[in-house]
Amino acid sequence: MFSFFTANQANDALPDVIKKFEYALAKKNEITKIEKQLQVCVSTTNSFKEYMILKQQLNSAITKFYQSIEILESTGVMIKSIEQGLLDFPSKRFDEKVCLCWKHGETEIKFWHEKDSGFMGRKPIEVNDESLI
């Protein structure tokens, strides 16, 4: 179910969101690893059996990755980039839709940006910024 986050709600949800993000990132990295193994297999061996095993592993890893994305998105966050570690929490500032933003490695939500400005438009959340719902 969709809802807007206050800064406090986003920070309260963050530990669980980080855990789910890191799981999705691990699944993404697993896909990359298997893809590299598959490329090596294709270029260095003629083993159809090895190719099929790797292909099945890749298919399974892709399925798990998409499941992890669904689980992460079920928290209400918007995934901007798994690779760059960027997530947005939908929020409102006065009556304008904005995003509270998080980058992998940050321990709390400290920034927001207009809906269309993205990461480069990040602005710090003021300590008593009551304009954010």
Positions of the model-derived regions?
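Glycine-rich, aromatic-bearing surface loops/beta-hairpins
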Residues: 71-133
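A structural signal for well-ordered alpha-helices, especially hydrophobic packing surfaces
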Residues: 21, 28, 62-65, 69
